[in-house]
Amino acid sequence: MTQQLKLGYKASAEQFGPRELVELAVLAEKHGMDSATVSDHFQPWRHNGGHAPFSLSWMTAVGERTKRLQLGTSVLTPTFRYNPAVIAQAFATMGCLYPGRIMLGAGTGEALNEIATGYTGQWPEFRERYARLRESVQLMRDLWTGERTDFKGEYYSTTGASIYDVPECGIPVYIAAGGPVVARYAGRAGDGFICTSGKGMELYTDKLMPAVSEGATKAERDVTSIDKMIEIKISYDTDPEAALENTRFWAPLSLTQEQKHSIEDPIEMEAAADALPIEQVAKRWIVSSDPDDAVAQVKQYIDAGLNHLVFHAPGHDQKRFLELFDRDLAPRLRALG
């Protein structure tokens, strides 16, 4: 089963308040988007002007206002400030309310969101965070069967736990990966795979996509059944100066992976990001005022095997972006699929 090309909208919870974020997702459906995903942050990456509405409340509100959008997190960490059993219950409920439209995008987590909510001790190294992710996914899937679940893991346990309302179609789990280790796990166990753009094409062609295929092969799975999602960071505007300047709010994306995973305070994150020159900030983004040029840059990811393109626009005028995307980019992109 070959996955079809899908175009999605990234709802920037770090940038917009809850009501505006809901209305933008409703507008995204009207402009033909196939999905809308939202980040799950307790704290934003930017203290001044930042936002952090609760992802699951947003998903439910958007679900009530839309008819066909696939809705999900990109991504949620079901392992520290959350109990994975409760997350399983929440997603099961949404799956019953909006059948076939809900997905859970899951990752290993960042200190920014977990330390503030009570995690004590030294922030865990990758090995523990990865182990927690795998264990939480297994527990949630056990609970989604609707059967009584006695689970005894290294980090989580349940005794006689049942989720009484589970959707017949299940809840697909998308695994977010920035390197081959977790990408292999996505291939073994994920219904979908999530990565982000702007890190050099070699990462996708030589590491991530081969790792997904390797994991699927070892698990005797058909890799074409896995929805391969990428958040494409794109600043498209017919005004080239606006296209460049719009990236500034998202300067934290240009910090190193180590900085993003270890910084605990949005004020500290903002200070580190604002010290970066605009040229460095813009490197993470496709910055373009020409639709053919923008599509040519996006096409690299399609050619690498990614089929679900979720577009993250950095500017504050998201309505303008959605209008321009619908007019200039979507027809060209769908012609590629």
Swiss-Prot record:
Pfam families (UniProt xref): Bac_luciferase (PF00296)
Active site: 41 (proton donor), 110 (proton acceptor)
Gene Ontology MF terms: coenzyme F420 binding; glucose-6-phosphate dehydrogenase (coenzyme F420) activity; oxidoreductase activity, acting on paired donors, with incorporation or reduction of molecular oxygen
Catalysed reactions listed for this entry: oxidized coenzyme F420-(gamma-L-Glu)(n) + D-glucose 6-phosphate + H(+) = 6-phospho-D-glucono-1,5-lactone + reduced coenzyme F420-(gamma-L-Glu)(n)
PANTHER family hit by this protein: 5,10-METHYLENETETRAHYDROMETHANOPTERIN REDUCTASE, PTHR43244
Protein EC: 1.1.98.2
Family to which the UniProt record says this protein belongs: Belongs to the F420-dependent glucose-6-phosphate dehydrogenase family.
Residues annotated as binding substrate: 196, 199, 260, 284
Coiled-coil segments on the chain, per record: none
Enzyme class: oxidoreductase
Keywords for the protein's UniProt record, in alphabetical order: Carbohydrate metabolism, Oxidoreductase, Plasmid
Species annotation: Rhodococcus jostii (strain RHA1)
Domain of life: Bacteria
Record bears the keyword Acyltransferase: no
Quaternary structure and interacting proteins, as annotated: Homodimer.
Gene: fgd2
List of residues binding coenzyme F420-(gamma-Glu)n: 40, 77, 108-109, 113, 178-179, 181-182
Entry's Gene Ontology BP terms: carbohydrate metabolic process
Name recorded for this polypeptide: F420-dependent glucose-6-phosphate dehydrogenase 2
Function description: Catalyzes the coenzyme F420-dependent oxidation of glucose 6-phosphate (G6P) to 6-phosphogluconolactone.
